[in-house]
Amino acid sequence: MLIIPAIDLKDGNCVRLRQGLMDDSTVFGEDPVAFARQWVDKGARRLHLVDLNGAFAGKPVNGDVVTAIAKAFPELPIQIGGGIRSAETIEHYLQAGVNYVIIGTKAVKEPEFVTEMCKQFAGHIIVGLDAKNGFVATDGWAEVSEVKATDLAARFASDGVTEIVYTDIARDGMMQGVNVEATVDMAKASPIPVIASGGITDMNDIRALAKVASAGISGAITGRAIYEGTLDIVEAQAYCDIVSD
């Protein structure tokens, strides 16, 4: 199970939101590349980038920052989400050195877009399912759909989606613990490996996820916990490596 540090980008800065609310953000720094270096130096094997402005705008806004991080760490797998709603955007990011693009809103509104992109960019497509009480939210989490997250995961089972990033919105940025049960349900809904996100606070959450990782959980994204020091990614990754051996 991979421990994946998150770098959320808003107005060019590295921030963290609470429950996805843009007006409830904490700015951690003005140099996202420096934060990326900090996590790389601690042994991160992948980075999770989110263009928060892009998620609301429906197109990349912090793309230059994403490109700068990708160029600074050419050997490091990077995944990007937020505002990815066209083949052109996906192609742009992949050419810039990003390894995986996360399709969120468009996956809910036009599932066939995911099917097509998996054919066009095989091995590079991740679906982001952000759920509130089990139902998928879209447009920077501003809207909640009537689509169940597990149903959508099952829909993509044979499309060639690389992974699913599953976020429990109610827990995101709240430091209240990860929703293990919902994450396992998501993993069981399809054969696609699931990356857990939202609420990861400390080693208790990592242990809880590692215990059920065999259900199909391939990673855990952590943001506020590593910025505020309640979780050490070196310790967390070392634990996951030992448990998986």
Swiss-Prot record:
Pfam families: His_biosynth. Keywords: Amino-acid biosynthesis, Cytoplasm, Histidine biosynthesis, Isomerase. InterPro entries: Aldolase_TIM, His_biosynth, HisA_bact_arch, Isoase_HisA-like, Isoase_HisA-like_bact, RibuloseP-bd_barrel. The active site is at D8, D130. Its EC number is 5.3.1.16. GO terms for cellular component: cytoplasm. It catalyses: 1-(5-phospho-beta-D-ribosyl)-5-[(5-phospho-beta-D-ribosylamino)methylideneamino]imidazole-4-carboxamide = 5-[(5-phospho-1-deoxy-D-ribulos-1-ylimino)methylamino]-1-(5-phospho-beta-D-ribosyl)imidazole-4-carboxamide. Pathway: Amino-acid biosynthesis; L-histidine biosynthesis; L-histidine from 5-phospho-alpha-D-ribose 1-diphosphate: step 4/9. It is found in: Cytoplasm. GO terms for biological process: L-histidine biosynthetic process; L-tryptophan biosynthetic process. One of its GO terms (molecular function) is 1-(5-phosphoribosyl)-5-[(5-phosphoribosylamino)methylideneamino]imidazole-4-carboxamide isomerase activity. Its main location: cytoplasm. It comes from the Bacteria. Belongs to the HisA/HisF family. NCBIfam families: 1-(5-phosphoribosyl)-5-[(5-phosphoribosylamino)methylideneamino]imidazole-4-carboxamide isomerase. This is 1-(5-phosphoribosyl)-5-[(5-phosphoribosylamino)methylideneamino] imidazole-4-carboxamide isomerase.
